Amino acid sequence: MTESTFPQYPRLVLSKGREKSLLRRHPWVFSGAVSRLEGKANLGETIDIVDHQGKWLARGAWSPASQIRARVWTFDKAESIDIAFFTRRLRQAQQWRDWLAKKDGLDSYRLIAGESDGLPGVTIDRFGYFLVLQLLSAGAEYQRAALISALQTCYPDCAIYDRSDVAVRKKEGMALTQGPVTGELPPALLPIEEHGMKLLVDIQGGHKTGYYLDQRDSRLATRRYVENQRVLNCFSYTGGFAVSALMGGCRQVVSVDTSQDALDIARQNVELNQLDLSKAEFVRDDVFKLLRAYREHGEKFDVIIMDPPKFVENKSQLMGACRGYKDINMLAIQLLNPGGILLTFSCSGLMTSDLFQKIIADAAIDAGRDVQFIEQFRQAADHPVIATYPEGLYLKGFACRVM
């Protein structure tokens, strides 16, 4: 495309010296870096980002109500943001997922992981025939039609379902949306396969897009720790860890969640895999309260899986989240038999691996126990982390031996 035919975009001018992160190809521009907007841009509209002298830096999406004023689509000045752009991004992402799916025998995976796949604010999970779409930023929402058109080009045989019913959209002035986009409605429970397990996924009503694909490798790793062991599975959701523990030969697995619907699906997942249901117990309760009750009654376990929801949404909540993580891990450590294994996770992006490890160490001190770190976990490989966006590494975990 020549200069004369190239679209003219409004220009976001940065303050002097605030271009360094973009020169390092970080995909966000924060409000404090902005000097002014030249021209008029609607919410989510494409803009050019320039330094204080007018030098072109990137092309992104405008979001005047967010602390992240712009999210970068491209660092290539010759690249226009259109259907062809989204088609290229989808095909680039699919190449890696094709290799993973063939290697690991997957029928479900994360197809687009936001910024790390060059599509900020876009999450797409594939569950067999269904593509589940989440648009989390103003720019992603503005480009909805182009993105869906690209998806139809790349995946003409797939149905698309929208799960953009996420509260974070409100921060950028967007309503929550959910429903079928193209093709048939997903069934109430869709069966998928993962490392030899059959699992039922609730695309329409489940958490996020229906299932936590990012914990796939951690669920598999669980099997090596559980043979003939009594396992406590906290924040169990639909029982992925429970099924994996049973497949690993555990003596008993107790799954705890506040959602009866999730526990009912967990029970169905055990039955679907023809595992011994008598070895599985399902408890609807608050994990914090139940752990304290178990401590008071002298209950003990050999393996505890701790996979809580996100405790921290912003920096102001970090200190409180640290206390929450410490308390819950302290309780878990106190319930473990000597030599027991704690598999503990944090999906909070603001929680670094180093900080999380320190919290576990502090929890062990408060519990009066020694802990050995024996294995480290992160999100599965279909959730890549691009080098210029370390925030993409949000899931971290440890296997700990409690002495």
From Swiss-Prot:
Subcellular location: Cytoplasm
Highest taxon, organism lineage: Bacteria
Alphabetical list of SUPFAM superfamilies matching this protein: PUA domain-like, S-adenosyl-L-methionine-dependent methyltransferases
Enzyme Commission numbers on file: 2.1.1.191
Transmembrane regions: none
GO cellular component, one term: cytoplasm
InterPro entries linked to this entry: PUA (IPR002478), PUA-like_sf (IPR015947), PUA_sf (IPR036974), RLMI (IPR023542), RlmI-like_PUA (IPR041532), SAM-dep_methyl-trfase (IPR019614), SAM-dependent_MTases_sf (IPR029063)
Keyword terms, alphabetized: Cytoplasm, Methyltransferase, RNA-binding, rRNA processing, S-adenosyl-L-methionine, Transferase
Domain PUA: 9-88
Keyword presence, NADP: no
Molecular-function GO terms, alphabetical: RNA binding; rRNA (cytosine) methyltransferase activity
Reaction catalysis annotation: cytidine(1962) in 23S rRNA + S-adenosyl-L-methionine = 5-methylcytidine(1962) in 23S rRNA + S-adenosyl-L-homocysteine + H(+)
Primary site of residence: cytoplasm
Family: Belongs to the methyltransferase superfamily. RlmI family.
PANTHER family, A to Z: RIBOSOMAL RNA LARGE SUBUNIT METHYLTRANSFERASE (PTHR42873), S-ADENOSYLMETHIONINE-DEPENDENT METHYLTRANSFERASE DOMAIN-CONTAINING PROTEIN (PTHR42873:SF1)
Protein role: Specifically methylates the cytosine at position 1962 (m5C1962) of 23S rRNA.
NCBIfam families, sorted: PRK15128.1 (NF011707)
Protein name: Ribosomal RNA large subunit methyltransferase I
Organism in which the protein naturally occurs: Salmonella paratyphi A (strain AKU_12601)
Upper lineage: Bacteria, Pseudomonadati, Pseudomonadota, Gammaproteobacteria, Enterobacterales
